[in-house]
Amino acid sequence: MNLTRREFAKANAAAIAAAAAGLPILVRASNLVTEADVTSLDWNKAPCRFCGTGCSVMVATRDGQVVATHGDIKAEVNRGINCVKGYFLSKIMYGSDRLTRPLLRMKDGKFDKQGEFQPISWEQAFDIMAEKFKAALKAKGPESVGMFGSGQWTVWEGYAANKLFKAGLRSNNIDPNARHCMASAVMGFMRSFGMDEPMGCYDDIEATDSFVLWGSNMAEMHPVLWSRVTDRRLSAPQVKVAVLSTFEHRSFELADIPMVFKPQTDLIILNYIANHIIESGAVNRDFVERHVRFAHGAEDIGYGLRPDDPLEKKAKNADKANTWSDIDFNAFAEFVKPYTLERAARESGVPAERLKALAELYAAPRRKVVSFWTMGFNQHTRGVWANNLIYNIHLLTGKISEPGNSPFSLTGQPSACGTAREVGTFSHRLPADLVVTNPKHRETAEKIWKVPAGTIQEKVGFHAVQQSRMLKDGVLNVYWTQVSNNMQAGPNVMQEVLPGWRNPDNFVIVSDVYPTVSAQAADLILPSAMWVEKEGAFGNAERRTQFWHQLVKAPGEAKSDLWQLVEFSKRFTTDEVWPAELLAKAPELKGKTLYEVLFRNGQVDRFPASDLAKGYANDEVDAFGFYIQKGLFEEYAAFGRGHGHDLAPFDAYHEARGLRWPVVDGKETRWRYREGYDPYVSKGSGVQFYGYPDKKAIVFALPYEPPAEAPDRDYPFWLATGRVLEHWHTGSMTARVPELYKAVPDAVVYMHPDDARQLKLRRGSEVRVVSRRGEIRARVETRGRNKPPQGLVFVPFFDANKLINKVTLDATDPISKQTDYKKCAVRIELLNLA
């Protein structure tokens, strides 16, 4: 059997993925037949439903069901391979407990907060929703209603939700679960470059000489990209891999420079590298003088806790966290001077020779470097700073915005970029990097949306963690969540999340496909369509927008989130939700429904149903009588075209395997800000960071500051949470795939063997993990894929029977408002020795 190197890499990646899950795999499958006339299968492309990598898969349907999937060999991202989760995509929609009817808590035929769930009609569901929304709006105004969305929304679902809440209901209290995963990356980009999202693309992998992973276990969280990294590392002798984490994991198996550091000291290591670059003469002076300016960021900014928390009261600049003052290069050099190799080694616990080897990767003038990071950086009380500090290193050396030189923030959800960030479903954002606090930005949105001036509120809405607090405090009273499971994924759930959901004055709606922990805590459950049961679009980590057609029908009465949002908008007239002074500016809108104003506005409804490609179903087209997905997308695209966020025409995406924006004159952009690649960069300039008016990026002077909570005598261990290869987020989909559940049925407490011995535990012992906020029971694992150092334990959060977020702290980055799930203090108590 003769294989090319690429064929071997593909086969090897498949074998690794299957072996990791304990699954058998055929030795050879070269006789695979996919022709529809032979198999009676219809094959169509779709992006994978899981992570932010954006793999494309081919989906087989027969008799109205998805029956198989395989990697799309025409896709640039994954080149025909999938990870183990991707291989089981065909099973995620068919769990035995799929939700198919709206369910309301009832007693004696009426809604009762303490009642049992009983099936009702969609008409009844929207009746009680409208009643609750209208009552709250009348009594307390737009601040009393809110929505929690998702980086798993399709582009048009997020856009419709954004429009409904910010323009229709005039509430900025809409935020996505991407607040928990990508908000620090967003603010890092915005502060350093004035624009969001990576400048590079996955093609950097094959062009670089060095990979540095900062708080990223790509081997399990982005395994298809890791297969490309592995291929590059094993194909070229000069290529090096450095991995930094607070515990050892599978990505360390490829590391030339492995580094386990003490929590929070990544800030020290980053500043040390900048200092090394300066002191060794490795600064790219010409690049820095032409393209960079320097600033000193506010310090002592707090920890995003409640205002009455002692740590918040103590912080000097909690209300000025996102401010800075200009400095020059010399001042920056003086600032990082104390971050010596000796200090970095002493405080981080990483051997000095490894730190120096890491710094030399960045400093070597002819060596290209790609820095990858995910939640280790972002879920951090100084996550924005960490993002800024890695950009400092690439900017000082000029190793940025060109093939093989890239600081690259990887996303965790399939459309955290495409929907949460680009569409602007955060409580402070509007599409294409616009923000609600800027009057010109609000004016732009109001003109595109054809609503009166002053419709969009200036005040930033409640962010994700704040939403939970405001529900608990009774400020937020009606709350709708879609495509998220915050009762399992949110921090400090017993003290700060559950109380607000069960507050008798509040009404909580959950739209989902399965009875998740969140659904079970709600008052009303709406059954949703998922993945290829609807037409959709996702945007991945390399700015690639990908479309798919609806391929099958949703079961029972389940409806897409888009249908739910748009249909619900018919329940409100402008007279009910807009003040008289606003209606006076647009009397022609008086008495119209929000559906008519927002979705039948002559723009969203301008594409007829006949524009839908022949042979495809589209339940929303059938329901509303026009091609609503196309209308929403083209209206949304108007925000970015001509402003560096250009999207291609709608129909182009159904033909392509995705396009990376900005797309200008039909051509996608692989590297932003670099002449010859980016059409927005002026000829002769070389590089322009055009997010700022002066077209320069900012290098920030930012110090080390300690975490919000650290181990002590009563709680002597660090706790870090995260994911495993076989499960995705809270396991609501993957736990219903028998093969994946069998491979990893339970979350365990990964612990160093010496810590276990000191506590008189052994592998398999049942323990209690206790923090100041809550506790869980789980079994100890002292072997296997994750190897914490002494003093740290790691617990995944996929297991609904072991809610580790009962234990976590709701501290957030004060700039991004993103939660730090990687650092809190716990103790371990023996329950059963085993």
From Swiss-Prot:
Region forming the signal peptide: 1-29
Gene3D superfamilies registered for this protein in UniProt: 2.40.40.20, 3.30.200.210, 3.40.50.740, Dimethylsulfoxide Reductase, domain 2
Keywords associated with the record: 4Fe-4S, Electron transport, Iron, Iron-sulfur, Metal-binding, Molybdenum, Nitrate assimilation, Oxidoreductase, Periplasm, Signal, Transport
GO biological process: cellular respiration; Mo-molybdopterin cofactor biosynthetic process; nitrate assimilation
SMART domains, per the entry: Molybdop_Fe4S4
UniProt keyword RNA-binding present: no
Binding, [4Fe-4S] cluster: 48, 51, 55, 83
Cofactor(s) this protein cannot do without: [4Fe-4S] cluster; Mo-bis(molybdopterin guanine dinucleotide)
GO cellular component: membrane; nitrate reductase complex; periplasmic space
GO molecular function annotation: 4 iron, 4 sulfur cluster binding; electron transfer activity; iron ion binding; molybdenum ion binding; molybdopterin cofactor binding; nitrate reductase (cytochrome) activity
Cross-referenced PANTHER family: PERIPLASMIC NITRATE REDUCTASE, RESPIRATORY NITRATE REDUCTASE
Known partners and oligomeric status: Component of the periplasmic nitrate reductase NapAB complex composed of NapA and NapB.
Function recorded in the entry: Catalytic subunit of the periplasmic nitrate reductase complex NapAB. Receives electrons from NapB and catalyzes the reduction of nitrate to nitrite.
Family of the protein in this entry: Belongs to the prokaryotic molybdopterin-containing oxidoreductase family. NasA/NapA/NarB subfamily.
Name of the protein this chain belongs to: Periplasmic nitrate reductase
Species annotation: Pseudomonas paraeruginosa (strain DSM 24068 / PA7) (Pseudomonas aeruginosa (strain PA7))
Taxon lineage: Bacteria, Pseudomonadati, Pseudomonadota, Gammaproteobacteria, Pseudomonadales
